[in-house]
Swiss-Prot record:
It comes from Pyrobaculum calidifontis (strain DSM 21063 / JCM 11548 / VA1). The gene is rps2. The lineage of its organism: Archaea, Thermoproteota, Thermoprotei, Thermoproteales, Thermoproteaceae. This is Small ribosomal subunit protein uS2. GO terms for biological process: translation. Gene3D superfamilies: Glucose-6-phosphate isomerase like protein, domain 1 (3.40.50.10490). It comes from the Archaea. SUPFAM superfamilies: Ribosomal protein S2. The keyword Ribosomal protein applies.
Amino acid sequence: MAEEAQYEYLVPLEKYLSAGVRLGTRLSNKYLEERGFIYAVRPDGLRIFDIKKIDERLRIAAKLIARYPPDRVLVHTTRPYGFKPVQMFCKFVGCKALTGRFIPGMLTNPNLSNYLEVDLLFVVDPRLDSQAVAEAAKMGIPVVALVDTDTPHQYIDFMIPCNNKGRKSLALIFWVLARQVLRERGELKPDQDLPVPPEEFETRLVQT
């Protein structure tokens, strides 16, 4: 417990909690359980992630992403709540953003007009973004992914366990990652923040 109390999170623990980053689903991937990512199960069956492990994986992911030329990293999501976070992340970090439909062949068919040459693929949800993941695996492109408690882990080279469905969770995750990648590159000082708060990464709900 003393060691846990001394651990310094990338953002205050309260921020992670209020954004719901640790909230999983009622379904569970045994592989994630074996890796120790799932901390507890609530009485209603909802799985809860270990926030310390989320934080640790974000640190490692930032180091990994920072090693690649930004224009050789593709960040993809088909989840609407992920559009704004991905676009903002790529704006600050310089990666390629692909939101919405992934056209088959974009990573495997050089004859396509929208063919992309990338060295690293980062997806928000391997289940929804399965076409991109499958093509990356076929081409030998490493895959980083946000994974929920029920996410399939096949072809994922590096997993970041978290709530990959929530609006606030995705905003905070990508804000933290963007800041940490820039710190790893030396473009931000170790104690320096992005010029915008996490809320600017959040998808806005439109009233109809």
